[in-house]
Amino acid sequence: MKTMRGLRNCSNDAVTLDLTVHPPPPPPLPPPAPSTVSSSTASTSLSFDEEETSESKIGRLISEHPVIIFTRFSSCCMCHVMKKLLSTVGVHPTVIEIDDGEIAYLAVEAAPVLFIGGTCVGGFESLVALHLSGQLIPRLVEVGALWA
């Protein structure tokens, strides 16, 4: 077997290629109506009245969802770890992206922030502390987000 100058072959293993023809992907879904925002982690769609204030939207979302995370970016690493921890115990939170101006309505200084049963738990450190203390699962059961 020929090798390129300065490089050597590290393996004699053969590579297998899967040449199976897969069906084409389904067509994309139509965009949501202008006044509706859908969440991939929520079981229901999140609808907003266009005239509703940011403060009342946030308050309503907190009261409607037993476990909700507000974040600046859904791709935030701390938000991802919070979702992963909650999903490990069987809960899939609603995740809402908010902008810097809306953070003030949450009465916290940083995002992501977690609410369980309408009560602010706090950020990632608070969630981990609640879990390590053994209080997370009973609290999730209490608010109906998890079955005992």
From Swiss-Prot:
Low complexity bias locations: 35-47
Regions of compositional bias (Pro residues) in chain numbering: 22-34
Keyword Lipid biosynthesis attached: no
Source organism, top-level taxon: Eukaryota
Disulfide bond found in the keyword field: yes
Coiled coil: none
Record region (Disordered): 16-55
Residue ranges annotated for the Glutaredoxin domain, each copy included: 55-147
Cellular localisation: Cytoplasm
Pfam family of the protein (one): Glutaredoxin
Any GO CC annotation of this UniProt entry: cytoplasm
Keyword annotations of the record: Cytoplasm, Disulfide bond, Electron transport, Redox-active center, Transport
Disulfide bonds: 76-79
InterPro entries: GlrX-like_pln_2, Glutaredoxin, Thioredoxin-like_sf
Membership in a protein family: Belongs to the glutaredoxin family. CC-type subfamily.
PANTHER family, per database record: GLUTAREDOXIN
Function: Has a glutathione-disulfide oxidoreductase activity in the presence of NADPH and glutathione reductase. Reduces low molecular weight disulfides and proteins.
Protein name, per record: Glutaredoxin-C10
Source species taxonomy: Eukaryota, Viridiplantae, Streptophyta, Embryophyta, Tracheophyta
Gene: GRXC10
